[in-house]
């Protein structure tokens, strides 16, 4: 382009179009900026023309009325002026500096003349720009008046622009005259360029409206309705442009048929009086399409006809629905009066209106631009390898890599003509368009574009192809051009052609994406060097042209010679990039990224096999491969994808999974997804450190972004930690948190996901290491060298092992810790291979075994004690930042107030924790490091079993975390360590004590006291507390929270924290549910241990004991595998729901977190779970042990799974619990998740889990239906909460992962109830058996268990504690549901939890209609929606108004967040139904 421009601009500025456009565009902009340019031009003009200042001035004055454009166009130099003043010096109108520079650098030099500037200076910026332009362009260019619209002129003699504002004319060009200027110059548009030209060069031609009409009918609808908005019609130059014919037709149809047309138009309940019919848009309703041969068609109706009357009633201004109803009322007889508007489109007009489209010309182009920006951002971000490669390929490579293709293009362009060249050039510069165009064209033509690219001579074939492609395109354009249409028309056609080509290719790719991949995939592999491109190439096909375009472009860009090196590099860069994308699709994504071509070849073959859930990959890929996902990603979740695109690619990459996840979760758990969005937004702002740091965080989906951001942030921290000796082991763990799930998804898909979350970060840095292995290696780097190898190896079938290693990063710490604990050789349930002790599955299995043993052992008095000790959960709940009196609370505290910090810390802590976990992994492994893998927090799960956790949970946790002591010498463990892992706790650093406390609890099993050090407890704590309270009251809130009710955000950067926390929890805070456990323990110290145990069960693990019961109730069945998860009421749900939640909220990369979020019910871990959950968890604590073990593995898996949203290999693959949850989730959102889980879960287990999942779902429903059961429990509220929660959760989360989510929340509720109501003994008793039999217990069984538990709980010392706790929770359960408890509140009311608020506030004892305004305010506060109480009070909303509040009313009351509205509506419904 540059060369062409230079060539042309040296003498004339042939591309007047640019200036013309600029001028046109600048007209509005003609403000200071424009004037400045004008001034400069003016001075230039003056210099060149040497026009006297007076002349300039006069010109300026006279031109005041002229449009800046015209003024500009008016040459200010009289001397060589063709007419009037101006010599059209190429530079007089230097509107577009670039052109000016190109065109007349010399002139520019001469031009600048201060004097003239002075002349212009009188016209200050305020002065008319026109005036400026006038004196700038004195002379012929002065606009005297507007031309009569609609007249058509044809150029009779060619004209080359002499000045900037002029346009070139070629004989035969159709020229549309826009205005008449001085000096015999007219302003008009030709070939899409607008500018001045001598009037003598054109001759008027009589329009042949009919001619146009013929062309317009078909095009009319498109042109009119597709490309123009109503506004543009009005602004269309004039009615004269439109040929209007009206007709009245009578349509008579048969009963079984329609009229054969599709009506489209503005929606309005009442006629839109503001609508002013115009010739171009005479009515609001028009025929979008008419079925050929249909009744309407036969009557002469055509697409684009406007409905003026329906059955003799005027409908010009009537809204769509009303018109449709009027048509329906007529039955089979319809009288329509329609107006057919035929636009008299001259090529100029078309060009003018469509010129803009050229930029839009191809979605590809737009994408390209966007991609470019993304790439640029990525470059900035540091995806230097992947992003840079892609960027370079796209941006720079166009010249470097595309050189061959570019030359061909240039040649072709030149041959075709400057305009064609221009068009081509544009795509070329975009690179994307050309490539995509070519691809699309080739694809459509059945040409294997990729093959040349892929196969051996990337250069030749690729370039050749591109050339061919280009030629083809050109030829197409040429054909179009040569089809006998005038040059002008040709030009118009050309851009449209490109546009169509691109559009077609793009759309085709979208629709045909799946098929194309199969045919093309083989080709793309060859470009493996450009792994990004080639491998993607097929994928792109799959996804759409966008991808292919990218691939092609990159390929084209990549020079043949460079191909090997570049390919390798690109492959690395892009490979990394795409690897993530591809990983989504391909089990061998790793292979793809492998350095050796062989893997790529394998990948190709695999690539052919799309993941069962391409979209699960899409999210990842989309984020990762900024371009590829464009189509599928968009399809699945355009919002996310686009966000990613617009955001930096890195961001996208980083959140790829989350993105996808986000989408799904959004839909499924309306509340959560909403919140996720808000979270992402808030978090990003609030938690730049956590979320922001990872650019990927900005991923489209707030949730994904938040989670991804948190993960990325954490990964970055991990990276730093890794780099630092202190955190080496933890680092790995943390990294794995992000990557952990990928371990299971070690398969390319999974790992990519990892890459998306963790890897991406890594990718940024070590991304380049190798094309194929680099991404993994990066992960490995983060995980640890050994891990990398394992990952690579496991990339395929043994994803579990490899993944385990990978996940080790995140869960790795846990896993690693775990591995010593579970050195037993576990056999992969699915593959039958020996599992790596540190693999998530092995850890999960070992955790499960431990849990079983522990559950058999009984919970000891610990849990009960914890419960008794722990009113903490209340405190915690009440105030997230308050230490509720025990470490868990502290942790919550940390979370609440330090949410952001916590998030960051958590990540960091997670990292350190993970590292520590690595150090202690032997001890921790028992804890179900799997869960911890995902979330360091989970690590503590097994440890939880040990009642003798140690001193206070906090201490214990700290110690455990800090100290890698086995057992729970948590108190021994230095706080510093916990702090390090504190990140995990988020508040761990701030509140190491709390974390240790949790840890201790987590250390519930004596064996796993060491595990506690993982600091998993903190997350559980939050989770637990939340769960506990929310278990009873606000399981749903998590979704809502995600949905938008980020009450938790109040706690700390709630929105981000929520996500971050979620992520953290998932990763390191998975233990949040354990938080619940923590709070469960009545006594701080004793309780702590149980609590710790609960906590220890990271969100999922902790749950096993407690969750188990709860799960039984709410879906513990699921928890069977994830019984450990069940242990935490939330945790259990977490496990079940962890997948769901994870999917919903934290799908991105932190199962645990997600789990926690859901488990917490309301405020997921993310929001305030940490603080509030603890109190709630208290009761749960005692259960922690029994369920703990099972859950632990479960959660771990879940956590792992969640992080690897990539296509999960087999839904059942993951741990039972995880698999269960993940299955739904996997199918829905992440293939990886399942994969991740699968390593953890055995085949049978997976199946069982699936079964349990469904059962749990049903149970949840049943449970929610049986609040009575819950009520029967000593903690009736809990039970009730559980029940309501369960169903709500189901409903809320059901979208996301119906069962998982539902149960996720519900289990929390159930669990909390169970935990709180059941004595630890009971729990262990029940838990063990239940777990053993199947997490799924009949709802009756669950209720039985729960019911008995309450009595047991009451009887057992824990029970009193539970009762106490319950009393808090219980009030909290109802109130909590509404967010009365801080914990509850902090999680924005979980929709499902929104039961009656369990609160001591008066409103809880009164019927809704008797509530006073303060009661309503208290109720809102209980829903964690205290931010709205003022408006409710101001508007005097009392209980009698609540049932009648509609969405609009709520919006008027300031409840603009969907999640908040949902929470309110759900809570209201529960209140009214209670």
Curated annotation (Swiss-Prot):
Positions of region (Disordered): 66-125, 392-413, 504-534, 659-920, 947-995, 1057-1153, 1195-1216, 1260-1401
Domain PDZ: 248-342
SAM domain location: 1411-1474
Residues glycosylated per entry: 1292
Compositional bias annotation for Pro residues: 513-529, 1202-1212
Chain span(s) of sequence motif SH3-binding: 1169-1175
Basic and acidic residues compositional bias, start-end: 711-722, 847-868, 899-920, 1119-1130
Swiss-Prot/TrEMBL domain comment: The PDZ domain is required for interaction with GRID2, PLCB3, SLC9A3 and CFTR.
Protein name per UniProt: SH3 and multiple ankyrin repeat domains protein 2
Gene: Shank2
């Amino acid at each position: 382009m540059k060369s062409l421009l230079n060539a042309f601009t040296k003498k004339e500025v042939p591309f007047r179009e640019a200036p013309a456009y600029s001028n046109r565009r600048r007209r509005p902009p003609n403000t200071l900026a424009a004037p400045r340019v004008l001034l400069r031009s003016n001075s230039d003009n003056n210099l060149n023309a040497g026009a006297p200042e007076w002349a300039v001035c006069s010109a300026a004055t006279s031109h005041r009325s002229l449009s800046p454009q015209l003024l500009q166009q008016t040459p200010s130099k009289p001397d060589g002026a063709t007419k009037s003043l101006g010599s059209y010096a190429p530079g007089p109108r230097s509107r577009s500096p670039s052109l000016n520079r190109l065109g007349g650098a010399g002139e520019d030099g001469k031009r600048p003349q201060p004097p003239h500037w002075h002349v212009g200076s009188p016209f200050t910026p305020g002065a008319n720009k026109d005036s400026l332009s006038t004196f700038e362009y004195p002379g012929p260019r002065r606009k005297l008046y507007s031309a009569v619209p609609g007249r058509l002129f044809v150029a009779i003699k060619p004209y080359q622009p002499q000045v900037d504002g002029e346009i070139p004319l070629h004989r035969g060009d159709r020229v549309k005259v826009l205005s008449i200027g001085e000096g015999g110059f007219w302003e008009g548009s030709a070939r899409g360029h607008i500018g001045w030209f001598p009037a003598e060069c054109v001759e008027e031609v009589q329009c042949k409206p009919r001619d146009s009409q013929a062309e317009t009918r078909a095009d009319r609808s498109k042109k009119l309705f597709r490309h123009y908005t109503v506004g543009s019609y009005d602004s269309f130059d004039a009615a004269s442009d439109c040929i209007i014919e009206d007709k009245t037709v009578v349509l008579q149809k048969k009963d079984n048929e329609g009229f054969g047309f599709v009506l489209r138009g503005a929606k309005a309940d009442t006629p839109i009086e503001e609508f002013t019919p115009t010739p171009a848009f005479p009515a609001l309703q028009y025929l979008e399409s008419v079925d050929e041969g249909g009744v309407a068609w036969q009557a002469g109706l055509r697409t684009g006809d406007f409905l003026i009357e329906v059955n003799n009633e005027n409908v010009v201004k009537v809204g769509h629905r009303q018109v449709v109803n009027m048509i329906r009322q007529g039955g089979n007889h319809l009288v329509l009066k329609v107006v057919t508007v035929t636009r008299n489109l001259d090529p100029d007009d078309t060009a003018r209106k469509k010129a803009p489209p050229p930029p839009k010309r191809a979605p590809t182009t737009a994408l390209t631009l966007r991609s470019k920006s993304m790439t640029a951002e990525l470059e900035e971000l540091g995806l230097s390898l992947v992003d840079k490669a892609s960027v370079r390929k796209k941006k720079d490579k166009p010249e470097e890599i595309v050189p061959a293709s570019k030359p061909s293009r240039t040649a072709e362009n030149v041959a075709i003509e400057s305009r064609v060249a221009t068009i081509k050039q544009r795509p070329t510069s975009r690179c994307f368009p050309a490539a995509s165009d070519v691809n699309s064209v080739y694809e459509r033509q059945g040409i294997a574009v990729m093959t040349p690219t892929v196969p051996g001579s990337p250069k030749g074939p690729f370039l050749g192809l591109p050339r061919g492609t280009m030629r083809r395109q050109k030829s197409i354009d040429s054909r179009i051009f040569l089809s006998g249409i005038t040059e002008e028309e040709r030009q118009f056609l050309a851009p449209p052609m490109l546009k169509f080509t691109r559009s077609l290719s793009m759309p085709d790719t979208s629709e045909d994406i799946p098929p194309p991949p199969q045919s093309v995939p083989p080709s793309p592999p060859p470009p493996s060097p450009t792994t990004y491109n080639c491998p993607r190439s097929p994928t792109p096909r799959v996804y759409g042209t966008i991808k292919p375009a990218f691939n092609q472009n990159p390929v084209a860009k990549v020079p043949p010679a460079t191909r090997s090196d570049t390919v390798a590099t690109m492959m690395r860069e892009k490979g990394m990039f795409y690897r993530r994308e591809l990983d989504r699709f391909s089990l061998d994504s790793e292979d793809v990224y492998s350095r050796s071509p062989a893997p790529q070849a394998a990948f190709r073959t695999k690539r052919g096999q799309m993941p069962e859930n391409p979209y699960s990959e899409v999210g990842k890929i989309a984020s990762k491969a900024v371009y590829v996902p464009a189509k599928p990603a968009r399809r699945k979740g355009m919002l996310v994808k686009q966000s990613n695109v617009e955001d930096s690619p890195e961001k996208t990459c980083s959140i790829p999974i989350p993105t996808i996840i986000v989408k799904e979760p959004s839909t499924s758990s309306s509340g959560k997804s909403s919140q996720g969005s808000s979270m992402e937004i808030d978090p990003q702002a609030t938690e730049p450190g956590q979320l922001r740091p990872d650019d990927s965080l900005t991923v489209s989906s707030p949730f994904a972004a938040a989670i991804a951001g948190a993960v990325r942030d954490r990964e970055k921290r991990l990276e730093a930690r890794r780099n630092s000796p202190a955190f080496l082991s933890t680092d790995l763990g943390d990294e794995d948190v992000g990557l952990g799930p990928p371990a299971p998804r070690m398969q390319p898909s999974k790992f990519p996901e990892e890459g998306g979350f963790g890897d991406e970060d890594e990718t940024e840095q070590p991304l380049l290491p190798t094309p194929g292995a680099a991404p993994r290696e990066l992960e490995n780097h983060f995980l640890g060298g050994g891990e990398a190898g394992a990952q690579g190896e496991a990339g395929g079938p043994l994803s579990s092992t490899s993944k385990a290693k990978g996940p080790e990063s995140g869960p790795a710490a846990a896993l690693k810790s775990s591995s010593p604990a579970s050195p037993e050789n576990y056999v992969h349930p699915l593959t039958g291979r020996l599992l790596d002790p540190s693999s998530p599955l092995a850890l999960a299995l070992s955790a499960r075994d431990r849990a079983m043993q522990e559950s058999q052992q009984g919970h000891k008095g610990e849990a009960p004690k914890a419960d008794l000790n722990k009113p903490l959960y209340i405190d915690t709940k009440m105030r997230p930042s308050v230490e509720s009196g025990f470490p868990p609370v502290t942790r919550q505290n940390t979370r609440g107030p330090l949410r952001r910090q916590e998030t960051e810390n958590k990540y960091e802590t997670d990292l350190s924790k993970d590292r520590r976990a690595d150090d202690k992994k032997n001890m921790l492994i028992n804890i179900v490091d799997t869960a911890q893998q995902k979330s360091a927090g989970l690590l503590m799960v097994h440890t939880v079993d040990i009642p003798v956790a140690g001193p206070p949970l906090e201490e214990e946790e700290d110690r455990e975390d800090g100290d890698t002591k086995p057992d729970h010498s948590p108190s021994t463990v230095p706080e510093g360590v916990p702090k390090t892992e504190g990140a995990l706790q988020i508040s761990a650093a701030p509140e190491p004590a709390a974390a240790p406390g949790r840890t201790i609890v987590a250390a519930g099993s004596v064996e796993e006291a060491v595990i506690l050090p993982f600091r998993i407890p903190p997350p559980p704590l939050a989770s637990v507390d939340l769960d506990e309270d929310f278990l009873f009251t606000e399981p749903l809130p998590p979704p809502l929270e995600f949905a938008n009710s980020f009450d938790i955000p109040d706690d700390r950067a709630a929105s981000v924290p929520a996500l971050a926390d979620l992520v953290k929890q998932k990763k390191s805070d998975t233990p949040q549910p354990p938080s619940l456990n923590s709070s469960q323990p009545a006594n701080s110290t004793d309780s702590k241990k149980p609590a710790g145990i609960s906590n220890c069960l990271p969100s999922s693990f902790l749950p096993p004991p407690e969750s188990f019961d709860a799960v039984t109730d709410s879906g513990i069945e699921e928890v069977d595998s994830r019984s450990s998860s069940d242990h935490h009421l939330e945790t259990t749900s977490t496990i079940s729901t962890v997948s769901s939640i994870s999917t919903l909220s934290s799908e991105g990369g932190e199962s645990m977190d997600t789990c926690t979020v859901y488990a917490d019910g309301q405020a997921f871990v993310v929001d305030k779970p940490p603080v509030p959950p603890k109190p709630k968890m208290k009761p749960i604590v005692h259960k922690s042990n029994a369920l703990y073990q099972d859950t632990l593995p479960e959660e771990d898996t879940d956590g792992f799974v969640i992080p690897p949203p990539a296509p999960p290999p087999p839904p059942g693959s993951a741990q039972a619990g995880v698999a269960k949850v993940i299955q739904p989730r996997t199918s829905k959102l992440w293939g990886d998740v399942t994969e991740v889980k699968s390593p953890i879960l055995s085949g049978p287990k997976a199946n069982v889990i699936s079964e349990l999942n469904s059962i749990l779902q049903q149970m949840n429903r049943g449970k929610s239906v049986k609040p009575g059961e819950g009520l029967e429990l000593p903690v009736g509220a809990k039970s009730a909460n559980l029940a309501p929660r369960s169903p709500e959760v189901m409903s809320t989360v059901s979208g996301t992962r119906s069962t998982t989510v539902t149960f996720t929340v519900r289990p929390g509720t159930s669990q909390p109830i169970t935990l709180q109501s059941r004595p630890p003994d009971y729990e262990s008793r029940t838990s063990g058996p239940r777990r053993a039999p199947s997490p799924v217990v009949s709802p009756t069984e669950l209720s039985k268990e729960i019911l008995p538990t309450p009595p047991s709980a009451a009887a057992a010392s824990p029970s009193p504690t539970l009762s106490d706790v319950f009393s808090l929770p219980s009030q909290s359960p109802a109130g909590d549901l509404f967010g009365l408890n801080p914990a509850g509140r902090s999680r924005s009311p979980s929709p499902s939890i929104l039961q009656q608020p369990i609160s001591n506030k008066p409103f809880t004892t009164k019927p809704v209609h008797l509530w006073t305004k303060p009661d309503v305010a208290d109720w809102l506060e209980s829903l964690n929606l205290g931010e709205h109480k003022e408006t409710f009070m101001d508007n005097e909303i009392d209980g009698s108004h609540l049932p009648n509040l509609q969405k609009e009313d709520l919006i008027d009351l300031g409840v603009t967040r969907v999640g908040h509205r949902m929470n309110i509506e759900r809570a209201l419904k529960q209140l009214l139904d209670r």
